[in-house]
Amino acid sequence: ANISAGLSLGEYSALIYSNIINFEDGIKIVQKRGTYMQEYLPEGNWSMAAILGLDDKIIEDVCKQVTKGFVVPANYNCQGQVAISGEKEAVLQAMELLKEAGAKRTIELKTSGPFHTSKLQEASDKLYDALQEIQINKIADKKVIKNIDATEYTDNDDIKRILANHVINPVKFKKSIENMIDQGVDTIIEIGPGKVLSGFVKKTNKDIQVFNTNNIEAFEQIL
């Protein structure tokens, strides 16, 4: 594959696959990322929710209308599916307002933190410090689309800063898939357990050929 992307933590898999980050460094930094995101959770009662069947703009506008605390879009997964993140009372209020605005479903998620929001700034700062200990390699022939803005990584990017900012910014997975398709991608292979990302791809563009695998043998057969 000449272009790859991952959702949230999966971006590290894409960076390792493309040899932008070495495998050993990737394992170390992923472990630290998880530790910091738990250790530096701000005080409070946090939650996330999946919102189905509404345009992104409506979800963004409704989140701004919430009066019971902090809530923002955190994951733009695919057409008609966005996850919101924030204080539990604010998330619950947003879910009610979004139902009134026409959402087909709102589903509270089993999460413990305001992930991919500005509330994780301290974890982001700690991660940036830890990233100074790893090596970033020159980008060769394998492109990686980054979550933060759905564009390709380049050698001019401050990749360590981008990865630190990754935990405090929304994941733009839908736009990432759209940009890959715009570059001529017509086949996507999801690597990992389950078929969640394959579903996101199909909802974004039903004409794309999608394969799913969780082992090397099957992956090689697909190729």
Model-derived features: positions:
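Conserved functional loop/turn residues at catalytic and ligand-binding sites
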Residues: 8, 102, 184
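Acyltransferase/transacylase module recognition
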Residues: 1, 129-132, 136-223
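Alpha/beta catalytic cores of group-transfer enzymes, especially the acyltransferase/condensing modules
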Residues: 17-168
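Gly/Ala-rich beta-loop-alpha elbow adjacent to hydrolase catalytic centers
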Residues: 2, 6-10, 22
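Glycine-rich beta-strand-to-loop/alpha-helix junction loops that act as flexible
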Residues: 9, 87, 191-193
